[in-house]
């Protein structure tokens, strides 16, 4: 069980969006490398990064900022946003990423995801971003008719390292994770699921370590961390204690 701090990149800066709207961006740190190092110093063991401009452009836009992050932290980094080809994946893994997140291309070309898992085993995750129960693509700008579980099941047995499931209706507004939908997805597939969107407070962390939620690989936190609604040391201690209890059972 992992708590992933999030760095969302827009125009080279760390921002948070409200409900996925690029016009509602709050800048939290103009220096992504410094933010990555700060999260490492707080005790986090992973980092979740999204190239927001890239998600809309269909190609990497904030490459220099991601490189700065990779240089600043020793922690493994997963990146989503604008990664659409096998060459993109190979390039980013060569530059030091641990895991790439494929979102739009997972809807448009599932076969590419399956091929990527074969070529880069253990390094490919799928991002499922949903609005109103349906999968959204192109930086959340377009809705599809595809259901969340329907898409996830396409990748059963393919070797996908994780599914990052984001509830767009809750993202960046601190209303709490959509636990019902997230756990339903986790029950439906054998692929590890990471919860994203809406993590609001220590209540979500306490919910995350309850027995039925321990099937998740973890959860992603953005605004709640930046706004000080989650105490990193307390959150990480809760997770560590839950892991120890699980091992002891």
Swiss-Prot record:
| Subcellular location(s) per record | Cytoplasm
For this entry, list what GO says about its biological process: L-histidine biosynthetic process; L-tryptophan biosynthetic process
Q: Which reaction does it catalyse?
A: 1-(5-phospho-beta-D-ribosyl)-5-[(5-phospho-beta-D-ribosylamino)methylideneamino]imidazole-4-carboxamide = 5-[(5-phospho-1-deoxy-D-ribulos-1-ylimino)methylamino]-1-(5-phospho-beta-D-ribosyl)imidazole-4-carboxamide
Tell me the active site.
8, 129
Q: Which UniProt keywords apply?
A: Amino-acid biosynthesis, Cytoplasm, Histidine biosynthesis, Isomerase
Look up keyword Amino-acid biosynthesis and say if it applies: yes
- Transmembrane intervals: none
GO CC annotation: what is one?
cytoplasm
Source organism of the structure = Rhizobium rhizogenes (strain K84 / ATCC BAA-868) (Agrobacterium radiobacter)
One annotated GO molecular function: 1-(5-phosphoribosyl)-5-[(5-phosphoribosylamino)methylideneamino]imidazole-4-carboxamide isomerase activity
Encoding gene per record: hisA
- Name of the protein in question: 1-(5-phosphoribosyl)-5-[(5-phosphoribosylamino)methylideneamino] imidazole-4-carboxamide isomerase
Describe which pathway this protein belongs to, using the record's wording.
Amino-acid biosynthesis; L-histidine biosynthesis; L-histidine from 5-phospho-alpha-D-ribose 1-diphosphate: step 4/9
Q: State which Enzyme Commission number(s) the record gives.
A: 5.3.1.16
Q: What is its main location?
A: cytoplasm
Pfam families this protein is in?
A: His_biosynth
- In which family does this protein belong, per the annotation? Belongs to the HisA/HisF family.
- Domain of life according to the entry: Bacteria
């Amino acid at each position: 069980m992992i708590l992933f701090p999030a760095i969302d990149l827009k125009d080279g800066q760390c921002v948070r969006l409200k409900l996925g709207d690029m016009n509602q961006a709050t800048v939290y740190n103009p220096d992504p490398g410094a933010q990555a190092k700060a999260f490492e110093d707080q005790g986090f063991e992973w980092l979740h990064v999204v190239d927001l401009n890239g998600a809309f452009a269909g190609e990497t836009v904030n490459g220099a900022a991601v490189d700065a992050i990779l240089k600043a932290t020793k922690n493994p980094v997963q990146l989503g946003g604008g990664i659409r080809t096998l060459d993109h994946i190979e390039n980013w893994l060569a530059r030091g990423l641990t895991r790439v997140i494929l979102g739009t291309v997972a809807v448009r070309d599932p076969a590419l995801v399956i091929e990527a898992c074969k070529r880069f085993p253990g390094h490919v995750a799928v991002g499922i971003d949903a609005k109103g129960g349906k999968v959204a693509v192109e930086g959340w700008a377009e809705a599809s008719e595809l259901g969340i579980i329907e898409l996830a099941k396409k990748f059963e047995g393919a070797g996908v390292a994780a599914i990052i499931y984001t509830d767009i209706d809750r993202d960046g507004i601190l209303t709490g994770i959509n636990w019902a939908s997230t756990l339903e997805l986790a029950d439906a597939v054998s692929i590890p699921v990471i919860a994203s969107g809406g993590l609001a407070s220590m209540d979500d962390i306490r919910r995350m370590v309850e027995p039925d939620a321990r099937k998740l690989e973890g959860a992603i936190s953005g605004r709640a961390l930046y706004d000080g609604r989650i105490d990193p040391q307390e959150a990480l201690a809760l997770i560590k204690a839950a892991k120890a209890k699980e091992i002891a059972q």
